[in-house]
């Protein structure tokens, strides 16, 4: 139900891929309700859509949600850096343990391919968010070695800040522009940015081309 998820699903629906169903798995009841009431994601207009309330921390629920599923795009994460520093236990439960639950559920249910969304902050991490995503990346890549004879692959798509996504800097800059000034941390600071459409294109490419063990970067 986040920025990426909505854009990704809209792309799939527009391209009319021959899928039987798309399961939208998230823990926020309100966001799911609002999304399901939208004309873009209404179950009456799109019979393939299914809305599941659940949390990646809850392995039992995740197991149920991924039964008879061929592909998983794992985008659940706590990603606000300051919040993560103040709530480290919660970040670990979602970003690391939650990722492990996705891996185990995928293997148990014979999923064909799993793509996990990562971040440039996982490279030489300097905060808990980056460190937790690095751990998650390691879990997904190494899972290609523990799957046994099951025909399942795990890959990672690692990109930077997605422009316009919830919690990104661009909406904040737009607000500041209305006040006539920009508050920045350092003049030498740089950010790696891609658009939502570019992020979706990367995941589509990964679904079509990865064989397991790759970390895809822009």
Please provide the spans of the model-predicted regions.
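N-terminal Rossmann NAD(P)H-binding glycine-rich loop of SDR-like oxidoreductase domains
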Residues: 1-17
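Residues in the short beta-alpha loop(s) of Rossmann-like NAD(P)-binding domains
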Residues: 28, 38, 120
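Conserved Rossmann-fold cofactor-binding substructure of NAD(P)-dependent oxidoreductases
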Residues: 50-71
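NAD(P)-dependent short-chain dehydrogenase/reductase
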Residues: 126-129, 134-214
């Amino acid at each position: 139900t986040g920025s990426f998820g909505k854009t990704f699903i809209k792309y799939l629906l527009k391209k009319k891929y021959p899928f039987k169903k798309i399961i939208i798995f998230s823990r926020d009841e309100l966001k799911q309700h609002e999304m399901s009431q939208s004309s873009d994601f209404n179950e009456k207009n799109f019979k393939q859509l299914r809305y599941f309330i659940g949390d990646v921390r809850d392995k039992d629920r995740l197991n149920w949600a991924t039964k008879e599923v061929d592909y998983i795009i794992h985008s659940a994460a706590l990603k606000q850096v300051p919040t993560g520093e103040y709530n480290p236990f919660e970040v670990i439960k979602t970003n690391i343990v939650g990722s492990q639950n996705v891996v185990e559920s995928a293997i148990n249910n014979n999923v064909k391919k799993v793509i996990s969304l990562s971040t440039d902050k996982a490279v030489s991490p300097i905060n808990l968010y980056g460190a937790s995503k690095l751990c998650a990346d390691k879990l997904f890549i190494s899972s290609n070695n523990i799957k046994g004879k099951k025909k399942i692959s795990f890959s990672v798509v690692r990109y930077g800040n997605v422009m316009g996504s919830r919690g990104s800097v661009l909406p904040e800059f737009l607000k500041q522009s209305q006040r006539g000034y920009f508050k920045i941390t350092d003049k030498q600071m740089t950010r790696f940015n891609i658009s939502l459409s570019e992020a979706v294109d990367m995941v589509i490419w990964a679904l079509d081309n990865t064989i397991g063990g790759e970390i895809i970067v822009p």
